């Protein structure tokens, strides 16, 4: 694949089977036939809504794919995937989660990045957008500002995000450094209702 210029790995950005954990095995079987390694990022729809705590709600995802926070290197890039969805329980989909990074997660990220050379490209993957969320008083963006501070220490940093179902680019300026946030459209496009687009965007 590499010699032909094709991707040698991929990464999802959450909401993989849309509240249907019984489909994990089908999804894994389908991805196993792609002949490339695929890393997973957890989204709000990957949490079990029958649970009442964040850790319990994410346990099923972790049993399928491993830790929600991890990192790896590819070439000159250091890639981090983190869970920035707090599942808090609730009666409606809009009230059962919030966005952000815990203090413990932020410390994990700080320690992880301390082993990365400052001239490296850092790619940070999560589910919920950072754009507009740099205030520590905003409970939907807790510690996102701290993440941006850490990313600003590197030569180049990009944030890869899902969640919103539409494409958007946002540029954060942090400590004099530009950090690019890429919000990616969903594979289902306009909820499977529009004309099929073979390259995957904008309509799935």
Feature names for model-found ranges:
Residues 21-118, 138-158, 169-204:
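Extended active-site neighborhood of metal-dependent phosphoesterases/phosphodiesterases
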Residues 14-15, 43-44, 127, 162-163:
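Active-site glycine-centered loops adjacent to acidic/histidine catalytic or metal-binding residues
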Residues 9, 37, 121:
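Residues at the starts of beta-strands that form the adenosine-phosphate
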Residues 13, 113-134:
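Short acidic, glycine-rich surface-loop motifs adjacent to enzyme active sites
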Residues 17-18, 46, 130, 166:
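Short active-site segment of divalent metal-dependent hydrolases/proteases
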Residues 1-25:
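N-terminal active-site segment of His-dependent metallophosphoesterases
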């Amino acid at each position: 694949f590499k010699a032909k210029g094709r991707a040698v790995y991929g990464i999802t950005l959450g909401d993989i089977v849309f509240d249907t954990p019984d489909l994990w095995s089908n999804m894994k079987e389908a991805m196993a036939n792609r002949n490339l390694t695929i890393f997973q990022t957890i989204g709000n729809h990957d949490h079990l809504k029958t649970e009442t705590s964040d850790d319990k709600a994410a346990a099923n995802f972790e049993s399928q794919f491993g830790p929600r926070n991890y990192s790896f290197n590819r070439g000159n890039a250091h890639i981090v995937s983190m869970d920035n969805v707090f599942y808090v329980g609730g009666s409606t989909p809009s009230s059962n989660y919030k966005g952000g990074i815990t203090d413990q997660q932020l410390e994990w990220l700080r320690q992880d990045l301390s082993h990365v050379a400052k001239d490296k490209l850092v790619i940070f993957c999560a589910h919920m957008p950072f754009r507009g969320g740099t205030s520590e008083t905003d409970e939907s963006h807790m510690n996102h500002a701290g993440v941006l501070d850490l990313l600003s220490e590197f030569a180049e940093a990009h944030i890869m995000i899902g969640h919103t179902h539409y494409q958007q680019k946002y540029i954060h300026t942090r400590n004099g450094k530009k950090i690019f946030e890429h919000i990616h459209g969903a594979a289902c496009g306009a909820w499977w209702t529009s004309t099929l687009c073979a390259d995957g965007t904008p309509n799935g």
